[in-house]
């Protein structure tokens, strides 16, 4: 009987100990979510008493970052055009308040929302930094940091935003999913055994009634992604471009005409079917004559976050391996 009682006491104490450990872990986790944090960004460091719950976002890439983390902002700039031009699986809910354009956000509307945090890009936010900081702690990011490697900056910024809203574990999963998508896209390209993996990539549109191209440079997010897929950019800009592209005209495409040409164009502004049709400078390009052109969706956002990068990688692999 004593032996049975002793065993019972040991089991009871063990169960109590396990219960206490679980409670302690819960308390620790809760405490961590309420701890003060420091966010590093292009304008320095910003301290928050605890992770932000009510966030206003004034640039699309950071809106995408928040949404990928499962966080709906309370306010967001230019929601209508975000939904039109940013091809990602997660969209803002109907409850998110539009706070004006990215270029001219509505400060009164932002103030009315009483946010815990404002996120924007430094090249836009610097001019209204004081006004924004009077409303709420403000962080500003800049893609041209991280040695002007837009992909490296994107991932680091995403981690900082995840930290700012207490979603670091969720952030790790988003980045892991992105890496898996890259690996899958690369495997698909390798399986296709392409003879030519040289590429040039551009956005095409009309500017001042002239067919215009943004030819992407090595430091751009998009070409850092395609590099991970085993593709090689052939466009030489001659210098590092802070924006990740060089804006030019059709005549400049001669330097990359031996490559596969990957392009993004909106259906309502398809310059290839309108202004360039019959244009000798366009029609005589080698990739045009040899049908080495690969169209991505018009809402492929090349200045975005992990979901945009994932979409880009998947699309590139699909179009490059599709039979023509």
Swiss-Prot record:
**Membrane-topology annotation of the record:** Lipid-anchor
Keyword entries, A-Z: Cell membrane, Ion transport, Iron, Iron transport, Lipoprotein, Membrane, Palmitate, Signal, Transport
Pfam families, alphabetized: Peripla_BP_2 (PF01497)
Q: Does the keyword Metal-binding apply?
A: no
Q: GO:BP terms for this protein?
A: iron coordination entity transport
Q: Which InterPro entries match?
A: ABC_transptr_periplasmic_BD, Bact_iron-sidero_bind
Q: How does it assemble?
A: Can probably form at least three ABC transporter complexes, composed of two ATP-binding proteins (FpuC or FpuD), two transmembrane proteins (FpuB) and a solute-binding protein (FpuA), or composed of two ATP-binding proteins (FatE), two transmembrane proteins (FatC and FatD) and a solute-binding protein (FpuA).
Q: What function does the entry list?
A: Part of an ABC transporter complex involved in ferric-petrobactin uptake.
| Family membership noted in the UniProt record | Belongs to the bacterial solute-binding protein 8 family.
- Protein name (database record): Petrobactin-binding protein FpuA
């Amino acid at each position: 009987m004593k032996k049975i009682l002793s065993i019972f006491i040991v089991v009871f104490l063990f169960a109590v100990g396990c219960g206490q450990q679980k409670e302690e872990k819960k308390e620790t986790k809760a405490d961590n979510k309420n701890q003060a944090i420091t966010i590093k960004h292009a304008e320095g460091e910003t301290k928050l008493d605890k992770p932000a719950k009510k966030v206003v976002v004034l640039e699309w890439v950071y809106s995408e970052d928040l949404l990928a983390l499962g966080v709906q902002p309370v306010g967001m700039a230019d929601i209508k055009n975000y939904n039109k031009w940013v091809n990602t699986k997660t969209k803002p809910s109907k409850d998110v308040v539009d706070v004006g354009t990215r270029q001219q956000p509505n400060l009164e509307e932002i103030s009315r929302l009483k946010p815990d945090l404002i996120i924007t890009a430094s090249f836009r936010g610097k001019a209204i930094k004081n006004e924004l900081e009077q409303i709420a702690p403000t962080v500003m990011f800049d893609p041209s940091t991280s040695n002007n490697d837009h992909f490296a900056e994107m991932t680091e910024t995403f981690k900082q935003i995840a930290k700012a809203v207490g979603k670091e574990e969720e952030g790790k999963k988003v980045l892991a999913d992105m890496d898996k998508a890259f690996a899958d896209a690369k495997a698909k390209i390798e399986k296709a055994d392409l003879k030519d993996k040289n590429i040039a990539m551009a956005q095409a549109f009309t500017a001042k009634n002239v067919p215009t191209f943004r030819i992407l440079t090595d430091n751009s997010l998009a070409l850092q992604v395609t590099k991970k897929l085993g593709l090689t950019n052939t466009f030489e800009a001659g210098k590092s471009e802070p924006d990740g592209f060089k804006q030019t005209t059709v005549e400049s495409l001669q330097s990359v005409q031996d490559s596969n040409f990957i392009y993004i164009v909106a259906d309502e502004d398809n310059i290839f079917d309108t202004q360039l049709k019959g244009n000798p400078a366009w029609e005589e390009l080698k990739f045009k004559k040899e049908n080495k052109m690969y169209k991505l969706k018009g809402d492929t956002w090349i200045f975005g976050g992990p979901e945009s990068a994932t979409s880009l990688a998947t699309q590139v692999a699909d179009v490059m391996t599709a039979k023509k």
